[in-house]
Amino acid sequence: MEARTTDLSDLYPEGEALPMVFKSFGGRARFAGRVRTLRVFEDNALVRKVLEEEGAGQVLFVDGGGSLRTALLGGNLARLAWEKGWAGVVVHGAVRDTEELREVPIGLLALAATPKKSAKEGKGEVDVPLKVLGVEVLPGSFLLADEDGLLLLPEPPSGVRSGG
């Protein structure tokens, strides 16, 4: 991804912007891709299930309700995401294994880190519209992330491809 979110936001005013309240934990600060969505709460079984699918340069956006009590992604799932071809994962919640996460060459954004693991019950919803920080995150939209924030567009901008 060469284009910056600030420049693209100016070019595409219809885009929705999420402020950079997220911290970068992965090996790439900039990434882009079509969005898959997931709504869970302190349970990451569905996170694993979705990341086991071929990522094809997509970005998984996980709405964990902003909970910082348990981690929805750690080193094992981050490596799985990379091996399956995901461009990145955004977690509106917490992650763990931060030292391992830095070694994985994909975008990994989350609100914070915590050592506590999550439940594994499989509760949640896949590919549903999300509302995060007042912004609608739709399955199939195109997400671009860099140090200035996250930009959501209905379609990929000209010349921008999925990946990091």
From Swiss-Prot:
Enzyme Commission numbers on file: 4.1.3.17, 4.1.1.112
Annotated positions binding substrate: 74-77, 96
GO molecular function: 4-hydroxy-4-methyl-2-oxoglutarate aldolase activity; metal ion binding; oxaloacetate decarboxylase activity; ribonuclease inhibitor activity
Function: Catalyzes the aldol cleavage of 4-hydroxy-4-methyl-2-oxoglutarate (HMG) into 2 molecules of pyruvate. Also contains a secondary oxaloacetate (OAA) decarboxylase activity due to the common pyruvate enolate transition state formed following C-C bond cleavage in the retro-aldol and decarboxylation reactions.
Record-linked CDD domains: RraA_family
Cofactor: Ni(2+); Co(2+); Zn(2+)
NCBIfam families from the UniProt entry: NOT-MenG, PRK09372.1
Uppermost EC category: lyase
Name of this chain's protein: 4-hydroxy-4-methyl-2-oxoglutarate aldolase
Residues annotated for a divalent metal cation binding in this entry: 97
Family (UniProt): Belongs to the class II aldolase/RraA-like family.
Record entry for activity regulation: Competitively inhibited by oxalate, a pyruvate enolate analog.
One of the GO biological process terms: regulation of RNA metabolic process
PANTHER family attached to this UniProt entry: 4-HYDROXY-4-METHYL-2-OXOGLUTARATE ALDOLASE 3-RELATED (PTHR33254:SF4)
Catalysed reactions, as listed in the record: 4-hydroxy-4-methyl-2-oxoglutarate = 2 pyruvate; oxaloacetate + H(+) = pyruvate + CO2
